[in-house]
Amino acid sequence: YCQFKMWTCDSERKCCEDMVCRLWCKLNL
């Protein structure tokens, strides 16, 4: 499950919506 302040970037459970999260995902993939 996606929880507040817990960002996941895997394709099965995408939680990334805002820009900061997407940048974080790019850096952490």
From Swiss-Prot:
Negative results: At concentrations up to 330 nM, does not show activity on transient 'A-type' Kv, delayed-rectifier Kv, voltage-gated sodium channel (Nav) and both HVA and M-LVA Cav channels in cockroach DUM neurons. It comes from Eucratoscelus constrictus. Belongs to the neurotoxin 30 (phrixotoxin) family. Its main location: secreted. Keywords: Calcium-activated potassium channel impairing toxin, Disulfide bond, Ion channel impairing toxin, Neurotoxin, Potassium channel impairing toxin, Secreted, Toxin. The lineage of its organism: Eukaryota, Metazoa, Ecdysozoa, Arthropoda, Chelicerata. This is Lambda-theraphotoxin-Ec2c. GO terms for cellular component: extracellular region. The presence of a 'disulfide through disulfide knot' structurally defines this protein as a knottin. Expressed by the venom gland.
